[in-house]
């Protein structure tokens, strides 16, 4: 009867989830803005992690000493092999404990201090650990150091004398207890007794008292199943150097996870949200190796607390917007760089530029505020008016018109330039649309794939409403001669300022050139005038000379009487 109830509940839950998915996806709307080559997908709701909840899980172990399983029977060999695995796992955990983040005091946030602690402690390790594992450990810590700081702080306290016994005593008569640790932090602790009870009450009596005579294979299978959790936990901690994510079902079973969620100090809506999205919760959770002592394996489980839920969220998709009326190789391009997830949060907007860090389940967006930037609500104006005066919208510029496509929630943005062939296709009808040069958008209704050159994109098949907002591409407002290229982290105002600087420089150059030309013209006029004056003077002098010469030549010669006499005639004198 109980199984039937569980199956009925599971079927009901599945139907409810499917109904929720269909209903929520139909509420998604998408607006494409032709002027900026961008699209906004709306209709999502937030689940933002704002804190962490830490709990301590303890797995009680058995002290297995020498066993009497030395027979040749297959079942005996299997039991002995499984017992050896158990003891090896315990030994591996004991060695690993000396190299955990808590043991080596790596709970600080700063990356340089993480590195110093890691280098110093790995030098002094007496445990033989490969260099590959050390590098992986260091890199992992640098990546998640801030996220797991609270969990490591709890894990460190468990290394203090008496802390494990304090937890054991609190769990003597119950499987759960709130324990106040030495640092003043109270944590919920849970114990797992399945493995210890099976070994002590079922397995060891057979092994030691009956000389390991096993009558059926079921005993072997039962022990393997019981032992698998410890072996897998050991493997995960060993491979991941003591810190694992996501949270596996070996670290915390589904029933244990749901029970832990129910005990968290959060609202019923938050509990309902987490309980219905356990896979997302696991992806954003951590388990941290702490200590193995007093026949107890203790590790910390760190779960996300979603402090902001049910506020509107939207996703911005952007693609390059380039000119198309200029010869090939001379086009200019502009791309919005503010793509990502946005969620309303206490009067402002939480912006998640790395959209892949957010997980989407139907219309619910699970994001970590550690990966967010806080922006004013005016940032939304960039979608409808990129030149608005209240928020400086972010863009990048280039002079490389690369064709590409961006898959959105309800369609695809296609940036098609040059000689690239861009098409949209239906799996049954083939190509149904060929895109011309420029930025365009296609809905997923009747479209299965988008092809840009040799690249094929599959569109999402969510249902919703599409809106195509037409407008003049803003790139056409810019002059290619003064448009700044390769501005990878800029804004509209910065680009416009550089354009104004370029225009001012051009105007100044024109003025200088004009002044130079004016000076040259004046000089030329003066030189020409001087030359003309000189020529006129020379011509005047020549004219006067000629006039005097001609006048002198035309005057008759008159002789005196003495000159005409024979005596005084010079012609006869000698």
Curated annotation (Swiss-Prot):
Residue spans, topological domain Extracellular: 26-524
Residue ranges crossing the lipid bilayer per the database entry: 525-550
Site keyed Cleavage: positions: 109-110, 136-137
Disulfide bond residue pairs: 37-439, 69-212, 313-343, 322-333, 358-367, 382-393, 416-422
Coiled coil feature spans: 76-96, 158-209, 481-516
Entry GO CC: host cell Golgi membrane; host cell plasma membrane; membrane; viral envelope; virion membrane
Alphabetical keyword list: Cleavage on pair of basic residues, Coiled coil, Disulfide bond, Fusion of virus membrane with host cell membrane, Fusion of virus membrane with host membrane, Glycoprotein, Host cell membrane, Host Golgi apparatus, Host membrane, Host-virus interaction, Lipoprotein, Membrane, Palmitate, Signal, Syncytium formation induced by viral infection, Transmembrane, Transmembrane helix, Viral attachment to host cell, Viral attachment to host entry receptor, Viral envelope protein, Viral penetration into host cytoplasm, Virion, Virus entry into host cell
Signal peptide limits: 1-25
Residues with glycosylation annotation: 27, 70, 116, 120, 126, 500
Cell cycle as UniProt keyword: no
Keyword Lipoprotein tagged: yes
GO biological process, one term: symbiont-mediated induction of syncytium formation
Intervals, Cytoplasmic compartment: 551-574
InterPro entries the UniProt entry points to: Fusion_F0_Paramyxovir (IPR000776)
Lipid-conjugated positions (S-palmitoyl cysteine): 550
Region (Fusion peptide): 137-157
Family from the record: Belongs to the paramyxoviruses fusion glycoprotein family.
Name used for this protein in its record: Fusion glycoprotein F0
Source organism (scientific name): Human respiratory syncytial virus B (strain 18537)
């Amino acid at each position: 009867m109980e199984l039937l109830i569980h199956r009925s509940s599971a079927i009901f839950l599945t139907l409810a989830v499917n109904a929720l998915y269909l209903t929520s996806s139909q509420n998604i709307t998408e607006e494409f803005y032709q002027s900026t080559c961008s699209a906004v997908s709306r209709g999502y709701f937030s689940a933002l992690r704002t804190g962490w909840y830490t709990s301590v899980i303890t797995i009680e172990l058995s002290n297995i000493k020498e066993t009497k399983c030395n027979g040749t029977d297959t079942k005996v060999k299997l039991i002995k092999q499984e017992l050896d695995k158990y003891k090896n796992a315990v030994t591996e955990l004991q060695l690993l404990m000396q190299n955990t983040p808590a043991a080596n005091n790596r709970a600080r946030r700063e990356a340089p201090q993480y590195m110093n602690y890691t280098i110093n402690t790995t030098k002094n390790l007496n445990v033989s650990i490969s260099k590959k594992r050390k590098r992986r450990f260091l890199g992992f810590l640098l990546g998640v150091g801030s996220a797991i700081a609270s969990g490591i702080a709890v894990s460190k306290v468990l290394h203090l004398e008496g802390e494990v016994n304090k937890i054991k005593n609190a769990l003597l008569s119950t499987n759960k207890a709130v324990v106040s640790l030495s640092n003043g932090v109270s944590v919920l602790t849970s114990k797992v007794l399945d493995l210890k009870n099976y070994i002590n009450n079922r397995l060891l009596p057979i092994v030691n008292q009956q000389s390991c005579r096993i009558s059926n294979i079921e005993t072997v299978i039962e022990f393997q199943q019981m032992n698998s959790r410890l072996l897998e936990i050991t493997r995960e901690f060993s491979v991941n150097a003591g810190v694992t994510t996501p949270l596996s079902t070996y670290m915390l079973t589904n029933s244990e996870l749901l029970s832990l969620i129910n005990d968290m100090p959060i609202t019923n809506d938050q509990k309902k949200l987490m309980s219905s999205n356990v896979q997302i919760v696991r992806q954003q959770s951590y388990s941290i190796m702490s200590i193995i002592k007093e026949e107890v394996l203790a590790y910390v489980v760190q779960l996300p607390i979603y402090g902001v839920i049910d506020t509107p969220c939207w996703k911005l998709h952007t693609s390059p917007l380039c000119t198309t009326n200029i010869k090939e190789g001379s086009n200019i391009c502009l791309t919005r760089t503010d793509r990502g997830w946005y969620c309303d949060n206490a009067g402002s907007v939480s912006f998640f530029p790395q959209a892949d860090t957010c997980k989407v389940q139907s219309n619910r967006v699970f994001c970590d505020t550690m990966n967010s930037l806080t922006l004013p609500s005016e940032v939304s104006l960039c979608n409808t008016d990129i030149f608005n005066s209240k928020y400086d919208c972010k863009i990048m510029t280039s002079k490389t018109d690369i064709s590409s496509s961006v898959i959105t929630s309800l369609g695809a943005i296609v940036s098609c330039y040059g000689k690239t062939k861009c098409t949209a296709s239906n799996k049954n009808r083939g190509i149904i649309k060929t895109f011309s040069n420029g930025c365009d958008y296609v809905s997923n209704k009747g479209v299965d794939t988008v092809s840009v050159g040799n690249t094929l994109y599959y569109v999402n098949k969510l249902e919703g409403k599409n809106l195509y907002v037409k407008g003049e591409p803003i790139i056409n407002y810019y002059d290619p001669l003064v448009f700044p290229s390769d501005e990878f982290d800029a804004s509209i105002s910065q680009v416009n300022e550089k354009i104004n600087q370029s225009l001012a420089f051009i105007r100044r150059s024109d003025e200088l050139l004009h002044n130079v030309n004016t000076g040259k013209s004046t000089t030329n006029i003066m030189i020409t005038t001087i030359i003309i004056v000189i020529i006129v003077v020379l011509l005047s002098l020549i004219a006067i000379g000629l006039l005097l010469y001609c006048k002198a030549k035309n005057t008759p010669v008159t002789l005196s009487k003495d000159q005409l006499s024979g005596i005084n005639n010079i012609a006869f004198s000698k």
